[in-house]
């Protein structure tokens, strides 16, 4: 694998929007018993459902440990799903995996960020994370894809959304957190994002969703649906702790323009719940020092915004919640050219994330 000493912007590469054509989606098999209950078996069943839903639209590659390879291969019994052996600490490939960039000559490259399990030893969710920190480079190695190294810059893919036309949305809660890149100022962080993703304007929302243990990833709160239009998690309940977060984000979005000078159209997505884990669900998680504790009194950061756009499809989470059907209707209205598939999201939420967090799209390069 070639490691490049330049930057994507300098070489004419950029991160495309999620709705751009894709060649495949990457996933990593869940099995960590101190994060996934009952040794990961319920989460694996949800993983299979999601992988098969995606595979209806495009190929899927699932990275699996040697110990779980036979089990995963047997369950992922579709021709469009490839299973490869890869060591990892957990399954969050949106955050541990690479960010792919393309140019207008049909070339694909990858950006390899530093991963510290959402905070390292200052609020991180587990240790060690050394295997996860290798996932990005291993994915690029498998794809024979040249790699940009970011010299220790900590970033998770779930903390950013781009429109492919020069604008990036993120949250201060995450990117300015002291446990990510405390040695860098906001301006220095913006410069890195500009160089490695080729964005010209960065929109900073104050916070993500309440109790999001990633420190407020934007992909669980606000996402692009097309250039100039975003979908924002929303509540009208003043007693909901998400209420001030939603309104603060809306104020920012309504009073700014994107890199192309467009005012934002903001669509609202109701927040499910409030959702909580049961005592039985929490009891099924191994208790290990240094790993995130699961507690039935702590509200879960459930969100329908945590969906994945694939070629011709939208794969979105359902929570056995009365709001599920409303969420599906909203997504179908916003994406009339796509088929909306609701997939089981509760087991993923119990582990700390959802469909977008557990997937990483690989764009299809094209010649202009």
Curated annotation (Swiss-Prot):
Task: Write out the entry's keywords from A to Z.
Answer: Hydrolase, Polyamine biosynthesis
On whether Hydrolase is a keyword of this UniProt record, the answer is yes
What reaction does this catalyse? agmatine + H2O = N-carbamoylputrescine + NH4(+)
Q: What Enzyme Commission number(s) does the record list for this chain?
A: 3.5.3.12
Instruction: Give the enzyme's main class according to its UniProt record, as a single word.
Output: hydrolase
Q: Which InterPro entries does the entry link to?
A: Agmatine_deiminase, Peptidyl-Arg-deiminase_porph
Instruction: Note the SS bond partners.
Output: none
Instruction: Kindly tell me the pathway this chain contributes to.
Output: Amine and polyamine biosynthesis; putrescine biosynthesis via agmatine pathway; N-carbamoylputrescine from agmatine: step 1/1
One protein family per Pfam:
PAD_porph
Question: Which residues carry out catalysis?
Answer: 357 (amidino-cysteine intermediate)
By its UniProt entry, which SUPFAM superfamilies does this protein fall under?
Pentein
Q: Which GO terms describe its molecular function?
A: agmatine deiminase activity; protein-arginine deiminase activity
User: Which GO terms fall under biological process for this protein?
Assistant: putrescine biosynthetic process from arginine
Q: Return the HAMAP family for the record.
A: Agmatine_deimin
Please give the subunit comment from the record.
Homodimer.
What's the family? Belongs to the agmatine deiminase family.
Q: What does this protein's UniProt record list under function?
A: Mediates the hydrolysis of agmatine into N-carbamoylputrescine in the arginine decarboxylase (ADC) pathway of putrescine biosynthesis, a basic polyamine.
Q: What is this protein called?
A: Agmatine deiminase
Species source reads Pseudomonas syringae pv. tomato (strain ATCC BAA-871 / DC3000)
Gene name on record? aguA
């Amino acid at each position: 694998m070639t490691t490049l000493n330049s930057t994507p912007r300098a070489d004419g590469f950029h991160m495309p929007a999620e709705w751009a054509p894709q060649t495949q989606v990457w996933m990593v098999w869940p099995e960590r018993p101190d994060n996934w209950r009952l040794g990961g078996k319920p989460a694996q069943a949800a993983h299979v459902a999601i992988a098969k839903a995606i595979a209806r639209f495009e190929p899927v590659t699932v990275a699996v440990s040697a110990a779980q390879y036979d089990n995963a291969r047997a369950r992922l019994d579709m021709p469009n799903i490839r299973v490869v052996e890869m060591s990892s600490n957990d399954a969050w490939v949106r955050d541990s995996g690479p960010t792919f960039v393309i140019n207008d000559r049909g070339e694909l490259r990858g950006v390899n960020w530093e991963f510290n399990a959402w905070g390292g030893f200052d609020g991180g969710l587990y240790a060690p994370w050394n295997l996860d920190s290798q996932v990005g480079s291993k994915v690029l190695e498998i794809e024979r894809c040249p790699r940009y190294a970011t010299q220790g810059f900590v970033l998770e893919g779930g903390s950013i959304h781009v429109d492919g036309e020069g604008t990036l949305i993120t949250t201060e809660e995450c990117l300015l957190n002291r446990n990510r890149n405390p040695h860098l100022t906001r301006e220095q962080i913006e410069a890195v994002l500009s160089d490695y993703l080729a964005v010209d304007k960065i929109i900073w929302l104050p916070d993500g969703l309440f109790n999001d243990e990633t420190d407020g990833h934007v992909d669980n709160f606000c996402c692009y649906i097309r250039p100039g239009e975003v979908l924002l998690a929303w509540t009208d309940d003043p007693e909901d702790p998400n209420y001030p977060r939603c309104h603060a984000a809306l104020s920012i979005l309504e009073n700014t323009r994107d890199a192309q000078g467009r005012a934002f159209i903001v669509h609202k997505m109701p927040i499910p719940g409030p959702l909580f884990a049961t005592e039985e669900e929490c009891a099924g998680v191994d208790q290990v020092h240094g790993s995130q504790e699961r507690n039935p009194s702590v509200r879960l950061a459930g969100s329908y915004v945590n969906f994945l756009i694939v070629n011709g499809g939208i794969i979105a989470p359902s929570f056995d919640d009365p709001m599920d059907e409303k969420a599906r209707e909203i997504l179908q209205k916003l994406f009339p050219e796509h088929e909306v598939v609701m997939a089981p999201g509760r087991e993923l939420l119990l582990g700390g994330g959802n469909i977008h967090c557990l997937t990483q799209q690989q764009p299809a390069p094209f010649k202009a």
